[in-house]
Regions:
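Polyanion-engaging groove/track-forming segments
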Residues: 1-768
C-alpha cells in the first residue's frame, strides 16, 4: 500500500521515520546488521538523516540513501534478474561516449536525417571537440526524455515520428534507434517491464520502502511507486507546508485574470489566499496535486502538523507568526502592536557582496552573544552561488593577515558545495598542465606551479628556496617560450629568436654557476652571477620541473586510446605531485582519471581521443560540487542554494537575493524538444525550483531568518531592486502586518558603504 506521511516540520517526519524503522526491525525480528534503504533527493538530506538517526537512537549504520532514479533501477534489477546489468549503460556518463561514437560513425553520418547534426559539428574549427559537446547535450536531453517523455522514446523505438520539430526530431530519433539496437534496456523500458513482473517478484521487493522529503517526482516515477505499492508498503514522507488543501491556489498573475471576470465572493476568497503559498509553492503544489490524483487520502491528514505555539516557540515572534500563517493556508492580517519587536526576521540592503558578508558576520556575533541557545552548527548561510561569496567568506571569517586578539569573538565556518576545480589549486594546475601543448610557457604560469604545495613537496622546495627561484627568474629575464622553435610555433613565424625564452634564461643561470664575475662572458649570453655553493641544488630542482613540463608537453600531443591517456595522466600525477599532506586531493584527481577510463571502456568506445576531449571531460568532472564535503561539520555552514535540501536550522541566512540573480535563470538547451513542445504535468522548472526553495527556507528557519541583497549601487549609489521572490515576500509582510507606516521599511536595514562608517558606532543608531 502507498502511505503518504505529511507534515510541515522536518523534525516530525524524521521522528516518524525512525519509529517506523524501529517497529519494522522489532516486528520482523531483523538483525542490526540488516541493511535499510531510505530514498532521498540530495546528499545533504542523507547527511542530516544519518546525524538525526544517530542522535535519537545512538547508532546509524548500514543505511543506504539512494536517489530516486537509482532506487527505481535497483528495484528493476530485483524484478527482472541478473540480465539487467549492475550499472545502466544509459547513465549519462556512459551515454555520452555511446552517442559520441554514433555521431562519429559512417552508419549515422551517411543517413539523410543526420545532415543537420553533421553540419553542426563538422563545420567548426575543432570538429571532434564540437562533436563531443553535442554528444553531451544529447545525453542530457535523453536523460530528461526517459524521465519526463518516455512515451516519445517508445514511439521513436517503433519507428514513429511525433512531428515535434523538423530540424531536431529526425536526427535525435535516429540516434535513439541506433542506441537501442544494441541494448534495449533503457530506463523507460525497464520501468515498464518491471511493473509487469512485480506480481511474480513480491518476495524480492523491499518491504517497506521509505521515500523521505522528496519534493518533486515525475509522473512516470509516481506511477512506478504506485504500482510497486500494490505489492509492498511504500511510505512517502512529504514536507507539506500547509495543513489545509492548497492544491487549487494560483499565482498573483492568474488571480488577476480571474478577478476581471469573477463575482465579488470569489474576489474575497482570492484576497484571503496565502500569497507565499500561491506565488512560491508551484513545485510543491504540483507534487501535492499528483498525489491527490492517485487518490491517497493520507495527504490531507493533519495529525503531524504543528503550529509554533505548540512547538515550544514564541508564537508572537514575527517569524513564527509568518510560519503559522503559511501552515493555515490563509492570510490573516495582524496588528503590529500585538507582536513584540524582535530580530527573528531581518532584511539587509547592502552595497556589495563583501559588505553582505561583513554585516552577516557582525549580526551572527550579536545573536550568539544575546542568545546562548544558538550554537554555530545551528546556523546555515546560503547563496545562489557559494563560489561567488567564498573569497569574501574567507577574508571576513578567516582573516589570515589579522592575528586574533585574546578574548575576541571568533566564528568558525565551513564552505560546502564547492567544486574541486574552484577550491583545490592542485586540480587547477593539473588541468592547466593539460594545456601544455598550447601553452606559451609564461614565467608567471610556472611560478604559479611552484606555489602549489604538492609540487613544492615533490621538489622538496622550501619557502626560502621558492623566493630564491623567483628572484633568479627575474634576474635571468625569462618571459615566455621554451625556445626559438616554440616561439615560432606560437607566433606562426620563422624569425623569432630565443631571447627571453626558458632555454636562453636557464643557460644564463647555468653559466653563472660556472663563471666568476671576473671571467669573460660568451658572445651570445649575458650570464647571471646569482648562484653559488649549495644554491646550485635549488637551481637543479627548478631545472627538473621545467624538463618534466617539456617532456609532458610533447607526450600530450596527438590522439590516443583511452588506456594510453589514463597511463600518461597517472604518470604526470606521480612525477609532479607528492601526496604527503595532500593525499585526499591527489586521490580525487586519480579517481577522476581512473573513472574516465572505466566510463569510456564500459561504453565500448575504442576509438582515439584528442587531448581537448580528455581535458573537457575532466573539467566537467571537477566542476561538479561536492555535496557532502563541509556540510554540517559542527560550524557555521555556508552553501549554495540547493533544491531539495530542506534541512531545518535554528538560523537560516540567505545572501545575494538580487534582481536577475535569484531565481536563477538557465538557458534552455537549444536542441531540447521538451522546451519547444507544450508543457506537461510534472515538468521540471529551474525557476519554480528556486521559488519553492525560498519558501522551504522560510519554513526551515526555527528561530531566525536573515535575508540580504545588494540594494545600492557601489558605483553611483542608485537604488537596486531585490530579487522578485524577496519583493513578493516584502509585499506579503506589508499585507500581513498592519502598521501606521509601511511595515517593510521598519524591517529592511540599509547598511552603509564602508564597515567603518560612523553610523555603525553610534549607540543611538539602529545599525549599532
Amino acid at each position: 500500500m502507498f502511505h503518504v506521511v505529511p507534515s510541515n516540520k522536518q523534525e516530525l517526519l524524521t521522528q516518524v521515520l525512525i519509529a517506523f524503522i524501529q517497529d519494522d526491525y522489532a516486528a520482523n525480528k531483523r538483525h542490526v546488521f540488516d541493511a535499510s534503504s531510505i530514498v532521498v533527493e540530495s546528499q545533504g538530506m542523507k547527511h542530516y538523516l544519518n546525524m538525526e538517526i544517530a542522535k535519537q537512537t545512538g547508532l546509524a549504520m548500514n543505511i543506504d540513501y539512494p536517489l530516486v532514479s537509482r532506487e527505481i533501477y535497483r528495484i528493476c534489477r530485483l524484478v527482472l534478474g541478473d540480465d539487467v546489468p549492475h550499472d545502466s549503460p544509459y547513465k549519462r556518463e556512459y551515454l555520452v561516449w555511446n552517442i559520441y561514437g554514433i555521431l562519429q560513425s559512417d552508419a549515422f553520418s551517411e543517413q539523410p536525417q543526420a545532415t543537420l547534426a553533421n553540419a553542426y559539428w563538422q563545420s567548426q574549427n575543432d570538429p571532434n571537440l564540437q562533436c563531443f559537446r553535442l554528444a553531451k547535450q544529447v545525453a542530457d536531453i535523453f536523460e530528461q526524455y526517459s524521465i519526463y517523455r518516455s512515451d516519445w522514446l517508445a514511439q521513436w523505438e517503433q519507428g514513429n515520428t511525433l512531428g515535434l520539430s523538423d530540424a531536431l526530431e529526425p536526427w535525435q530519433q535516429l540516434i535513439w534507434r541506433m542506441l537501442t539496437q544494441d541494448n534495449k534496456q533503457h530506463p523507460a523500458y525497464l520501468r515498464a517491464a518491471a511493473i509487469e513482473g512485480l506480481a511474480n517478484a513480491t518476495e524480492l521487493l523491499p518491504n517497506p520502502l521509505y521515500i523521505f522529503a522528496v519534493n518533486t517526482l515525475s509522473p512516470t516515477q509516481i506511477t512506478f511507486f504506485s504500482e510497486l505499492a500494490k505489492h509492498t508498503d511504500v511510505y512517502l514522507f512529504f514536507l507539506n507546508p500547509c495543513s489545509e488543501y492548497w492544491g487549487d491556489l494560483v499565482s498573483d498573475k492568474v488571480a488577476l485574470k480571474r478577478q476581471l471576470a469573477n463575482s465579488i465572493e470569489i474576489l474575497q476568497a482570492e484576497e484571503q489566499r496565502h500569497p507565499l503559498l500561491a506565488n512560491l509553492g508551484s513545485q510543491g503544489r504540483a507534487l501535492f496535486n499528483q498525489l491527490q490524483d492517485i487518490h491517497y487520502p493520507d495527504i490531507t491528514d493533519n495529525q503531524l502538523f504543528i503550529a509554533p505555539e505548540l512547538d515550544g516557540h514564541n508564537a508572537t515572534s514575527i517569524l513564527h507568526t509568518i510560519q503559522a500563517d503559511i501552515a493555515s493556508g490563509m492570510l490573516n492580517p495582524t496588528a503590529i502592536n500585538a507582536i513584540e519587536p524582535d530580530r527573528s526576521l531581518q532584511i539587509h540592503s547592502c552595497y556589495s557582496p563583501v559588505r553582505e558578508v561583513q554585516v552577516l558576520h557582525d549580526e551572527l556575533l550579536r545573536i550568539l552573544q544575546h542568545d546562548p541557545s544558538i550554537q554555530p552548527h545551528e546556523i546555515l548561510v546560503m547563496c545562489p552561488s557559494v563560489e561567488e561569496y567564498a573569497p569574501f567568506v574567507n577574508s571576513v571569517f578567516r582573516p589570515v593577515h589579522k592575528p586574533q586578539a585574546p578574548g575576541s569573538p571568533q566564528l568558525v565556518c565551513s564552505i560546502a558545495d564547492r567544486a574541486p576545480l574552484d577550491s583545490e589549486s592542485a586540480v587547477m594546475m593539473f588541468l592547466d598542465m593539460l594545456e601544455l601543448p598550447d601553452s606559451r610557457f609564461s614565467v608567471l604560469k610556472i611560478i604559479d606551479y611552484l606555489h602549489i604545495p604538492m609540487v613544492q613537496t615533490k621538489l622538496t622546495l622550501t619557502p626560502d628556496e621558492l623566493s630564491m627561484c623567483q628572484l633568479w627568474l627575474e634576474q635571468a629575464n625569462i618571459k615566455w617560450g621554451v625556445n626559438a622553435a616554440h616561439k615560432n610555433g606560437i607566433l606562426h613565424s620563422n624569425d623569432s629568436d630565443e631571447i627571453y625564452s626558458w632555454e636562453w634564461g636557464l643557460q644564463r643561470l647555468a653559466l653563472g654557476c660556472l663563471h666568476s664575475a671576473a671571467a669573460g662572458q660568451p658572445a651570445n649570453y649575458d650570464y647571471v652571477i646569482a648562484i653559488e655553493g649549495l644554491n646550485t641544488r635549488v637551481l637543479a630542482k627548478l631545472l627538473v620541473l621545467i624538463e618534466l613540463l617539456k617532456q609532458f608537453r610533447n607526450a600530450l600531443t596527438g590522439a590516443k586510446s583511452i588506456a594510453q591517456w589514463v597511463v600518461l595522466l597517472q604518470e604526470m600525477l606521480a612525477e609532479l605531485f607528492a601526496s604527503s599532506n595532500h593525499e585526499e586531493v591527489l586521490k580525487t584527481i586519480h579517481k577522476a582519471v581512473v573513472d574516465l577510463g572505466k566510463q569510456v571502456e564500459f561504453a565500448g568506445f575504442d576509438g582515439l581521443l584528442e587531448l581537448a576531449i580528455i581535458r573537457e571531460s575532466l573539467t566537467d568532472r571537477f566542476s561538479i560540487p561536492d555535496a557532502l564535503n563541509q556540510f554540517l561539520t559542527g560550524q557555521v555552514t555556508f552553501s549554495s542554494m540547493v533544491p531539495m535540501r530542506s534541512v531545518p536550522f535554528k538560523m537560516i541566512c540567505i545572501l545575494g537575493l538580487n534582481d536577475g540573480v535569484f531565481p536563477r535563470v538557465s538557458a534552455p538547451n537549444s536542441i531540447d524538444l521538451i522546451a519547444v513542445s507544450p508543457p506537461q504535468k510534472g515538468d521540471r522548472s529551474r525557476r519554480n525550483e528556486d521559488r519553492y526553495l525560498f519558501l522551504e527556507a522560510i519554513l526551515s528557519a526555527r528561530e531566525y531568518l536573515y535575508l540580504s541583497y545588494q540594494g545600492q549601487s557601489v558605483k553611483d549609489n542608485q537604488t537596486l531592486e531585490p530579487s522578485l521572490v524577496l519583493q513578493e515576500f516584502i509585499d506579503y509582510l506589508n499585507r500581513k502586518f498592519t502598521t501606521p507606516d509601511c511595515f517593510a521599511e521598519t524591517v529592511i536595514q540599509v547598511q552603509p558603504l564602508q564597515p567603518f562608517s560612523t553610523s555603525l558606532f553610534d549607540t543611538s543608531s539602529e545599525l549599532y
